[in-house]
């Protein structure tokens, strides 16, 4: 990287080295890209991360097990519910605690609503980044209503701290179920409207089709997860293939990229996989709300006040909005983790940018970053 930055550029050609960031509206956080260009064509774009590093993992090792839960909200502030859940499951495995069925249903309901809200931000900002502002406003309108319901459930709109080791903090408020079902009725009509507005727009499709294609082999090799992996044609979803919580009780499809507008694995496929996932998340929430009344009322397992798991190690994996989120926790028998490691989808997504950016137009870098749906705190932690 130093050679790239310090090399003297020949004034007789159009080569330039640009800093794209670290404070740029299209980078979706404090991220920098060192872009080597030849005219309007990129030779490569190198991610330069670390601006938002906060020692989250070390904090998890010096904070008691329950005390670390609010910090997990800061790993992915756009969809914090999954960071809560992944950590809770890891500690529950160490304690050998069985979570009550109702709490598992509540985790699925809150998680899938947050997945919809996160994808609305992803597809909305993607359209805005390439020049279409109206779809972003439509997405924010729907997201704000979801945030209202999440706030009524747990008291927060962004950093939820809803999960507890052994269950969840609150049950459904009175009337909440009927309001969410009514919202889903409207939302299911909104998705076709959104498709008519932007998805099937010829200009939009041409802007994303055959751009920054990630092959199936590349996606697997770089360890991509979630919509980025499925957008490349890999049929893999933790909720279905390694089911956890209440997910074995629900019927849903896993959208996979098919080259809808161009090549399998291009920007459009990654975009449209997220659109289809919102439909499936709505379907899961419906099923959960219709059956949660059949579960016992307990929302918390019996967990000791001073959490001191036996010595051992566990790995938990959940399907977040950005793909597989994993926690590796090592216990030494005390009330603090000896080692805590989190794995997120945004970090692996960043790693592939240098490999696939060569030959793209400079303007396509914005489309590429948006299609990967990276969130800066997930990268640096």
UniProtKB/Swiss-Prot annotation:
Q: Please give, as recorded in its UniProt entry, the membrane topology of this protein.
A: Peripheral membrane protein
Look up the domain of life of the source.
Bacteria
Keywords for the protein's UniProt record, in alphabetical order: Cell inner membrane, Cell membrane, Membrane, NAD, Quinone, Translocase, Transport, Ubiquinone
Alphabetical GO CC annotations of the entry are: plasma membrane
Q: What is its main location?
A: membrane
Where is it localised? Cell inner membrane
What this protein catalyses is: a quinone + NADH + 5 H(+)(in) = a quinol + NAD(+) + 4 H(+)(out)
A Pfam family that the UniProt record links to this protein? Complex1_49kDa
Q: What family does this chain come from, according to its entry? A: Belongs to the complex I 49 kDa subunit family.
Q: What is this protein called?
A: NADH-quinone oxidoreductase subunit D 1
């Amino acid at each position: 990287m130093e050679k790239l930055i310090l090399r003297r550029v020949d004034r007789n050609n159009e080569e330039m080295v640009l800093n794209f960031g670290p404070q740029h509206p299209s980078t979706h956080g404090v991220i920098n890209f060192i872009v080597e260009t030849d005219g309007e064509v990129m030779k490569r774009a190198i991610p330069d991360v670390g601006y938002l590093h906060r020692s989250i993992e070390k904090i998890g090792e010096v904070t008691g097990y329950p005390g670390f839960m609010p910090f997990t909200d800061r790993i992915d502030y756009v969809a914090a519910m999954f960071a809560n859940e992944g950590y809770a499951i890891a500690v529950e495995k160490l304690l050998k605690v069985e979570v009550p069925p109702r709490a598992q249903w509540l985790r699925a309901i809150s998680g899938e609503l947050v997945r919809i809200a996160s994808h609305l931000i992803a597809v909305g900002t993607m359209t805005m980044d390439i020049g279409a502002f109206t779809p972003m406003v439509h997405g924010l309108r729907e997201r704000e209503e979801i945030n209202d319901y999440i706030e009524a459930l747990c008291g927060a709109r962004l950093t939820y701290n809803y999960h507890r080791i052994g269950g969840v903090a609150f049950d459904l408020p009175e009337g909440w179920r009927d309001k969410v079902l009514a919202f889903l009725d409207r939302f299911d009509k909104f998705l076709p409207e959104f498709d008519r507005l932007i998805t099937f727009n010829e200009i939009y499709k041409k802007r994303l089709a055959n751009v920054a294609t990630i092959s199936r082999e590349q996606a697997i090799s770089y360890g991509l997860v979630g919509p980025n992996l499925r957008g490349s044609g890999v049929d893999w979803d933790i909720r279905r293939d390694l089911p956890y919580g209440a997910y074995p009780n629900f019927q849903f499809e896993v959208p996979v990229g098919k080259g809808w507008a161009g090549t399998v694995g291009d920007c459009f496929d990654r975009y449209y996989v997220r659109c289809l996932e919102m439909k499936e998340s709505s379907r899961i929430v419906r099923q959960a709300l219709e059956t949660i009344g059949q579960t016992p009322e307990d929302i918390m397992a019996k967990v000791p006040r001073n959490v001191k798991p036996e010595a051992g190690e566990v790995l938990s994996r959940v399907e977040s909005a950005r793909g597989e989120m994993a926690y590796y926790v090592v216990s030494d028998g005390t009330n603090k983790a000896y080692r805590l490691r989190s794995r997120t989808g945004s970090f692996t997504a960043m790693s592939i940018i240098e490999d696939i950016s060569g030959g793209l137009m400079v303007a396509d870098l914005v489309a590429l970053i948006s299609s990967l749906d990276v969130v800066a705190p997930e990268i640096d932690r």
